[in-house]
Amino acid sequence: MSMSANTMIFMILGASIVMAIACLMDMNALLDRFHNYILPHLRGEDRVCHCNCGRHHIHYVIPYDGDQSVVDASENYFVTDNVTKQEIDLMLGLLLGFCISWFLVWMDGVLHCAVRAWRAGRRYDGSWTWLPKLCSLRELGRRPHRPFEEPTGNMVHVKQKLYHNGHPSPRHL
């Protein structure tokens, strides 16, 4: 599956929106809410797993207080055996960025469908012919090669300088 230019642009746009949210808002408050509210509901009280897979079985998770328990920093407490709070914050931020990116890609598709449906009703109006070319990144670099016509109906021939291989020179169009 090849990614189109629109997909890449919207993924970068989504990542920049996440960075803007992180810079403008207190991202630590959002992540602390995740750690203090959502994770305890998933783990349950006293680190009891309340998963639906074994509803009648209660699995107690006993934390291992080994060498890693010496770390006392609130920014670096250990959530599981190998994953720290900072790593979960990183994964949550990346997940949030991808969700926003894919939402923007979906909105781009919805916009294109809406524009196509709207233009289908206005087929004979030529005032919106620039919109699909603006939305299509492939067409931005290409120039339309239409023959120029004079008002009398005679064709005007435009001479272009060509490269040695026959392609038109972009400097002399």
UniProtKB/Swiss-Prot annotation:
<dbReference type="GO" id="GO:0160045">
    <property type="term" value="C:TMEM240-body"/>
</dbReference>
<keyword id="KW-1133">Transmembrane helix</keyword>
<protein>
    <recommendedName>
        <fullName>Transmembrane protein 240</fullName>
    </recommendedName>
</protein>
<keyword id="KW-0472">Membrane</keyword>
<dbReference type="GO" id="GO:0098688">
    <property type="term" value="C:parallel fiber to Purkinje cell synapse"/>
</dbReference>
<feature type="transmembrane region" description="Helical; Name=1">
    <location>
        <begin position="5"/>
        <end position="25"/>
    </location>
</feature>
<feature type="transmembrane region" description="Helical; Name=2">
    <location>
        <begin position="90"/>
        <end position="110"/>
    </location>
</feature>
<dbReference type="GO" id="GO:0097060">
    <property type="term" value="C:synaptic membrane"/>
</dbReference>
<keyword id="KW-0812">Transmembrane</keyword>
<keyword id="KW-0770">Synapse</keyword>
<feature type="modified residue" description="Phosphoserine">
    <location>
        <position position="169"/>
    </location>
</feature>
<keyword id="KW-0597">Phosphoprotein</keyword>
<dbReference type="GO" id="GO:0098839">
    <property type="term" value="C:postsynaptic density membrane"/>
</dbReference>
<dbReference type="GO" id="GO:0150053">
    <property type="term" value="C:cerebellar climbing fiber to Purkinje cell synapse"/>
</dbReference>
<dbReference type="Pfam" id="PF15207">
    <property type="entry name" value="TMEM240"/>
</dbReference>
<keyword id="KW-1003">Cell membrane</keyword>
<dbReference type="InterPro" id="IPR027947">
    <property type="entry name" value="TMEM240"/>
</dbReference>
